[in-house]
Amino acid sequence: MRVQVGEDKETLEEVFDGRTLTTVMHLLNRGRLRELQGAVKSGKESRIYRGIDMKGGDVAVKIYLTSSAIFRQGRLKYIRGDPRFKDIPHDTRSLIDQWASKEFKNLQLAKEAGLAVPTPIYVEKNVLLMEFIGKNGVPAPHLREVPLQAASSWYDKIVEMLQDLY
């Protein structure tokens, strides 16, 4: 087992606090991951890393930033009033862990409904493992990154998927 990280120190400290490092080490030690490689996508609330599973296949490792005030500001409105969050302490780490769990469950529901979403694999604390969408470690582009002609052909598919989900 090995961990490869090619980011600068600031990014490492932002993503890999002691608790998150412990969680990643648990995933490696329990055979959920064989390797954790570099970041493939970065956002305000999380980073997505390429991971290698025990069979040598790619997996996406989404790590929610535990120190992010942006997370608390941006997601609190979705948590208030949701019965799944009523018994969760409202400290940032607990909310982030619950948000990762909620995303895992929503991906399961969407997959069961036959939607084209990454297959959720496992969630622990603020770390979510899911199917890697891409080839040879290169993630598939977001819809906003696809040429307009190609993106427009997806519109009807997206509307249909939303109807299937709801």
Predicted regions and their residues:
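Conserved kinase catalytic-core segment
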Residues: 149-166
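AlphaC helix of the protein kinase catalytic domain
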Residues: 137-148
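Conserved ATP-binding subdomain of kinase catalytic cores across diverse folds
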Residues: 4, 12-139, 163
